[in-house]
Amino acid sequence: MSEQNNTEMSFQIQRIYTKDISFEAPNAPQVFQKEWEPEVKLDLDTASSQLADDVYEVVLRVTVTATVGEDSAFLCEVQQAGIFSVGGIDGTQMAHCLGAYCPNILFPYARECITSLVARGTFPQLNLAPVNFDALFMNYLQQSEGAAQQQDA
């Protein structure tokens, strides 16, 4: 038997934690005087690093910016991180695990932090919709392949 046949896929969450958190309301209290019809922008980013054999840190950065007219109402950024044990996979499967599966686990924690911070800033409730990290990962792969093909041309 080859060594590959003896290797089973394993996945375990070791820890989930808030790595960095920031909330700014640069135009308070004036922004509270305005009619609340915000334009809300959501930015997502992920990063991963190997800590040890089969142990990875994945960081999901979620930034929410709300503007009312020309004024910034609030800027909220959360870096939600997790330490994961992942074994028995490599290549595209590992990239998918670290780039989509783990961020999908982290997002509800980041969403709760953002919702809490916005409420503590006394702004109306902010409900962030679930994110399809699998679709975002597939889009990233397609863009990467397109960029590689353009460089080869």
UniProtKB/Swiss-Prot annotation:
Its main location: cytoplasm. Belongs to the SecB family. It is found in: Cytoplasm. InterPro entries: SecB, SecB-like_sf. The gene is secB. The keyword Ligase does not apply. GO terms for cellular component: cytoplasm. One of the proteins required for the normal export of preproteins out of the cell cytoplasm. It is a molecular chaperone that binds to a subset of precursor proteins, maintaining them in a translocation-competent state. It also specifically binds to its receptor SecA. It comes from Erwinia tasmaniensis (strain DSM 17950 / CFBP 7177 / CIP 109463 / NCPPB 4357 / Et1/99). Keywords: Chaperone, Cytoplasm, Protein transport, Translocation, Transport. This is Protein-export protein SecB. One of its GO terms (biological process) is protein tetramerization. Pfam families: SecB. Homotetramer, a dimer of dimers. One homotetramer interacts with 1 SecA dimer. GO terms for molecular function: unfolded protein binding.
